Amino acid sequence: MATQISKKRKFVADGVFYAELNEVLTRELAEDGYSGVEVRVTPMRTEIIIRATRTQNVLGEKGRRIRELTSLVQKRFKFPQDSVELYAEKVANRGLCAIAQAESLRYKLLGGLAVRRACYGVLRFVMESGAKGCEVIVSGKLRAARAKSMKFKDGYMVSSGQPTKEYIDAAVRHVLLRQGVLGLKVKIMLDWDPKGKQGPMTPLPDVVIIHTPKEDDVYIAPAQVVTQAAFVPEAPLTTTDYPAMPVA
């Protein structure tokens, strides 16, 4: 017998489930370019779509890795048998995915690359991928014992209002280095895309679109054909026409 719960409890339960699932997959698939998860609940089963840059590593050899993840999720969240299905979806453009770039920056720093060089590399790659703006913030013990933050920006970035929810893709990651923990924050501003593939379909509120004027139709009057009147010679004047006319 299905238990009845209020709408508020249902939303809270769904939010907690999504947060825990995202945390589990972030730890398991960090090295495989994990970029987010989407949960679709159908009457028959629950579908979980994992977005990653390297989907082949997520699937594993002959689908072994994805089956292990399915079993893990099923036992962790107590799903009935064969009621949950996991799929792997490749990220179309990883340069416009903040989570993928934050993970990339994290592994660059773990590999010993300088902070400034790693951040500028991420910044350049994001802008070359078609983003409208990008911001990278690294905070922690960067050089000296005193903690500080470094901010790298390029392009155009909005910071308030509804466009921040539609246009800004942000991600936060932490990396443990020898001097301590560094915090990494990547913000990417997408560009307006009427098709909705590379960015939001709704334009920014302050964007003014100037359309090219239409060409004026030039009215050409039909040519008039002037026909020359036929010359009719006049008859010579006579006394009949003018009786008072003297006769030469």
Curated annotation (Swiss-Prot):
Methyltransferase listed as a keyword: no
Keyword RNA-binding: yes
Cysteine pairings via disulfide bonds: none
Biological process according to GO: translation
PROSITE patterns registered for this protein in UniProt: KH_TYPE_2
GO molecular function annotations of the record: mRNA binding; structural constituent of ribosome
Domain named KH type-2: residues: 21-92
Pfam families: KH_2, Ribosomal_S3_C
One GO CC annotation: cytosolic small ribosomal subunit
CDD domains on file: KH-II_40S_S3 (cd02413)
Alphabetical UniProt keywords: Phosphoprotein, Ribonucleoprotein, Ribosomal protein, RNA-binding
Modified residues (Phosphothreonine): 212
Protein family: Belongs to the universal ribosomal protein uS3 family.
NCBIfam families linked: PRK04191.1, uS3_euk_arch
Annotated protein name in UniProt: Small ribosomal subunit protein uS3x
Organism this protein belongs to: Arabidopsis thaliana (Mouse-ear cress)
Primary gene name: RPS3C
